Amino acid sequence: MTMMITTGNSFEGKVIKQYLGIVRGIVVRSPTISQGLMGGLKSIVGGKIGAYSEMCEHAREEAFQLMIEHAQALNANGIIAMRYDTGEIGQAGTEVLCYGTAVII
């Protein structure tokens, strides 16, 4: 079954038959020692920290997939109002939350 996902509150041309509630995927990541060292050096001289960007992108994708799995467990075929949120966990960890409202269309 294909999961339709939007950041909007509806799907154009579709009728939402049932709202199933909030679904989410949460991932907490921290950089490896080498990523931390390289990131520290880059923060001194400036520039893009590629290892951190890659780590964050993987965390977002994993959180997104976990949100879809949560919606599938509710037999949803759509997610509306999808959002990302991030936060720090301690000094070394980053939390990525992906959430939305599961629906049947």
UniProtKB/Swiss-Prot annotation:
Instruction: Enumerate the SUPFAM superfamilies for this protein.
Output: YbjQ-like
**Signal peptide location:** none
Q: Which domain of life is it from?
A: Bacteria
Q: Which family does it belong to?
A: Belongs to the UPF0145 family.
The protein, known as: UPF0145 protein lpg0197
Q: Which organism is it from?
A: Legionella pneumophila subsp. pneumophila (strain Philadelphia 1 / ATCC 33152 / DSM 7513)
